[in-house]
């Protein structure tokens, strides 16, 4: 445990009283189970599972079938306890508080054997007045109740009508009634994750002492007035005033870089008080705005605020303040029924390019700063500008949002309600009110957060009747829905934060949903709001199966993670596609067969007899399939941004499902557990590029669109080439010299009937040739090289097995992989792998159209040339047969 005294940033003079001491109770505690047969040290913040693993009482919970083997841990009731001395004289302070930033989840709290309160919500901060019970030496206990048992009890107590779903699908091997507890919803299992409803103190816990007044929270909300064309900052400070007399004083705000300093007089009455201040930014000073990644800088301004209060109390805080505006534009579109649905940042329409974020681990104490940095940097490295924090996980750590601010990642923030109906008893709603108020105040200062969304998929679940409720009861469930998301959550958001939009659900029809009583008649409409779309049976190479929607905030296909990732949590008997382990790890019903179905549409299944080799080959093919499917779908959304076809289009967002993994298993992720890039993530780096040529066929005609995320028009040259699979030398080249791609638009650059294309390249047929194309300026490559297959690759003719050799050299902190192919044929889907060595390549999963190629490797931890050489392997499609 550590003492943190909150010293002022400026030195106090005579008679000045510094803010009181803050004593962290982080560190070593004790944890014991219900019958005291187990007692062991436990680290706080932390979880029971982590303590048991750390002391050798259990294996890695993710190993093989341990999610089932260790179910007993979540069904037991655990107690955390500690003793501590306070390093200050308690008689000198008017108030002493015990503060928990996060308790997971249901616990009775005993301070010196006195029950001071209970917790039942993982997502809120708890503060307890211990002034009258604190001693020089103190004991603290948290008696947890099993979250599984609590949820079951709450469900049984709800006798009027069922609140489905009662239990998850059997494939998920999860627990029931998660909608009755304010806990990470996926901790009871999901279709990509295990069931580990653990118990623990998952965030900081501390003792705070103070006199006169205490600053509980402080927020900064920059607002732009279009009429005056000036910025103001709305500052909100929440105080706990312990003085029985009114407390006067002065607050001074300083932003040196903006030449802004302002002083205001304030007076605080006894009790919980909120002070709101407006700081006007000088109009003669240029304010640099915060921009999403790829659109500008993430400029922030160092700001200090000093509260000089009666009694000599001075409280000074420092923060970085960012200026940006966000608008959700829903307005009529020429040539289309319905309304637009897109975001303007600082007045500029922005196409949302990115993915969906889930918790990075079942145990948040394992999510380090380094891991968050790695995962979020990987999103930026793949040219993403948006992540949707999905509503079945957690409101992320402070550091997550700070990193998003710094990296320019826009955050679509769900509230934590997902794929379920929820109760609306007074106690439940009161807990939700505290949760939402706390989270909005915690997060609203972050420029990265651009929208609040009330829930994940609960509107569509009601309308389509996912849970088979009796139609006669639908009115009851709709009333509960409106009570929770509109009358409770929405009202709090509108009162706490007027700077960003709110939608009640995702997907939603936006204002159309509102006018239809919050449950839209057609939540799958392509002409309003956002959409979630999944189709595992239609041919994913056929772009016509995808919806030409306004914004697609979920879509995806599964794949298996790398063998090196699985190897850490399995053993040799598990290494086949049909093993018990493979079936156990797949939590999506029929998921393994769905992957093979998509693979077989365009590829032959592996033919090697070695079962482990066949397993590795199948893993590889699922990653190829996933990458190619999502490439096709994403490129369709990208090229639909500037057109209306049959009343549909103006697509302004593509957020595929999902970015990251919670454990080592088949899922929709592009980043494996721990951060290793799947093939999809390398593809995303290309298809989310700022300037991209997109090729496709329609009614026998081959088109190339130019898609731009740039802020100005660019004259470019489009080069289209046809190659035989058997030769890297292009047979034909078509060049368009006068292509001017307009800023922020998608436009046709090239079109030609495929029959004419093949006729002009006389030695080409659909089966023997492939098309590549790229944009350039003055012989400089200006876009990724893209490609279009003229046939399924299982029908392709002329492919030759390639023996690709590598020479590795070190260049500073990087490594250069010089690749050389033994054949002059084109090699599809070349996959470079260095096993478990952390890092990523500059490119991967590519078509090798040159005999020699250099690729960079960026290590995430120190490594050596010899380690890389030993771990290196290369796989291509031709190696499988």
UniProtKB/Swiss-Prot annotation:
Glycans are attached at residues 35, 77, 89, 113, 226, 297, 302, 803. Pathway: Glycan metabolism; N-glycan degradation. The active site is at residues 457, 554. It holds the Pfam family Mannosidase_ig. Residues 1-18 form the signal peptide. GO terms for cellular component: extracellular space; lysosomal lumen. One of its GO terms (biological process) is oligosaccharide catabolic process. One of its GO terms (molecular function) is beta-mannosidase activity. Its main location: other. Substrate binds at residues 190-192, 456. It is found in: Lysosome. SUPFAM superfamilies: (Trans)glycosidases, beta-Galactosidase/glucuronidase domain, Galactose-binding domain-like. InterPro entries: Beta-gal/glucu_dom_sf, Beta-mannosidase-like_N2, Beta-mannosidase_GH2, Beta-mannosidase_Ig, Galactose-bd-like_sf, Glyco_hydro_2_cat, Glycoside_hydrolase_SF, Ig-like_fold. Disulfide bonds join 167-176, 540-629, 732-761, 764-769. It comes from the Eukaryota. Keywords: Disulfide bond, Glycoprotein, Glycosidase, Hydrolase, Lysosome, Signal. It catalyses: Hydrolysis of terminal, non-reducing beta-D-mannose residues in beta-D-mannosides. Its EC number is 3.2.1.25. Monomer. Exoglycosidase that cleaves the single beta-linked mannose residue from the non-reducing end of all N-linked glycoprotein oligosaccharides. Belongs to the glycosyl hydrolase 2 family. This is Beta-mannosidase. It comes from Rattus norvegicus.
